[in-house]
Amino acid sequence: MSYTPQQHRVNKKLGECLAIANQHFSREFPCPTVTYKLRGKAAGKAYLQLNEIKLNQVLFSENEDAFINEVVPHELAHLITHQVFGRVRPHGNEWKYVMEKVFNVPARTTHSLEITSVQGKTFEYRCDCTTYPLSIRRHNKVIRNQSTYRCQQCQQTLAFTGLQLS
């Protein structure tokens, strides 16, 4: 299998982080499988039982350095945490420990990447005080009478304006 330069950088960062974790915990962690088929707004996702990391190729291409320095250690920390501590909260103290004390990376639970290119369709909803963009999934739930959404300030039920934003 041939790797792109981006994928080489991911593998190199994984190797570096694994070596640090191996030394810190005095054990050998298996190298996870990495795939680039994650869709939507998530940057990455760790599959604990499979020892696999899925990365969002579109967001990766647009934010390569952030992925290498933040997303790859973040997802690997989930796998390491699971293998060392077992079943714990996804972003709990054990995960924070691996991020900050082992990998020396700030323990952020969400990314701040620009997601316009992967966002999908959004629809405008409003109440008396403001407007909200709702995803196509939430919009469809409203249309099918499966859900309603309320304003965070005035608690009024949001109503579709008829406008598709993107």
From Swiss-Prot:
Cofactor: Zn(2+)
Transmembrane segments: none
One Gene Ontology MF term: zinc ion binding
Entry keyword annotation includes Amino-acid biosynthesis: no
Disulfide bonds: none
Location(s), subcellular: Cytoplasm
Pfam annotation, one family: SprT-like
Keywords for the protein's UniProt record, in alphabetical order: Cytoplasm, Metal-binding, Zinc
GO cellular component: cytoplasm
Classification via InterPro entries: SprT-like_domain (IPR006640), SprT_Zn_ribbon (IPR035240), Uncharacterised_SprT (IPR023483)
Cofactor binding description: Binds 1 zinc ion.
Residues that coordinate or bind Zn(2+): H74, H78
BP-aspect Gene Ontology terms: response to stress
Residues annotated as the enzyme's active site: E75
Boundaries of every SprT-like domain copy: 21-160
PROSITE patterns xrefs: ZINC_PROTEASE
Predominant localisation class: cytoplasm
Protein family: Belongs to the SprT family.
UniProt name for this protein: Protein SprT
Organism, as annotated: Vibrio atlanticus (strain LGP32)
Phylogenetic lineage: Bacteria, Pseudomonadati, Pseudomonadota, Gammaproteobacteria, Vibrionales
